[in-house]
Amino acid sequence: MKILVTNDDGVRAPGIRSLAEALRNIGDVVVVAPDRERSAVGHALTLHHPLRASEIRPAVFAVDGTPTDCVNLGIHTLLGSRPDIVVSGVNCGGNMGDDITYSGTVSAAMEATLMGIPALAVSLATSGRGDNYAVASAFAARLVRIVSERGLPPDTLLNVNVPDLPLEKLGGAVVTIQGKRDYEGKIVTKTDPRGRNYYWIGNGSLQFRDLEGTDYYAVKRGLVSITPLHLDLTNYASLTTLKTWDFAEMTL
């Protein structure tokens, strides 16, 4: 089994090193990851300047681009043949609820799914630097085995969030839905020595709604959350309402 591993924390991050090590026990692993941290870049793709990839160790490539770039380069060029599965992670910090829309980790798995390749995004839900990457990596390896045997439904990826706990304190794994976070938008404004303003985004408080059945609810209770995601963003519940609107009267 050929496994492409990527992330958004950068090729030297502890999470991806741990993940690659665990997956080497079950397949041929090639790491293609950003050469620096690219957290919260979402599904960005580099189109207006060339990308460079350096093989910093055997089967480990550092790319001066985004996680989505890395998946593209890995699948179409660097691996030589299509991987059987793509695993993105292990991210430092959870990717739950609405946060997945920002996540480079999840977007890398989405890119693989767009190309018809099974994919997982794996995150360690920690508020610090993370102590239990090995636990998350071991779980990811077990899940890769299951996916390789059973496959995934079309256009589906798995978003996995593992509590930052020792193995003996984990309460098992559950399938969940995407949760909901309440955002308090806040911009911090500062002034540089030349009198020009600069800004920091995202300094407000961030709270998840503790709703049963969601990813956050599970992780908060020491459970591994496995959320199936798909690429169709259509809001089907709104179709009936919108079809009652008379768009024919709109003038352009």
Swiss-Prot record:
InterPro entries hit by this protein: SurE, SurE-like_Pase/nucleotidase, SurE-like_sf
Protein name as it appears in the record: 5'-nucleotidase SurE
Family annotation (Pfam families): SurE
Keywords assigned by UniProt, alphabetized: Cytoplasm, Hydrolase, Metal-binding, Nucleotide-binding
High-level lineage: Bacteria, Pseudomonadati, Thermodesulfobacteriota, Desulfuromonadia, Geobacterales
Gene Ontology molecular function: any one: 5'-nucleotidase activity
Cellular localization per UniProt: Cytoplasm
Required cofactor names: a divalent metal cation
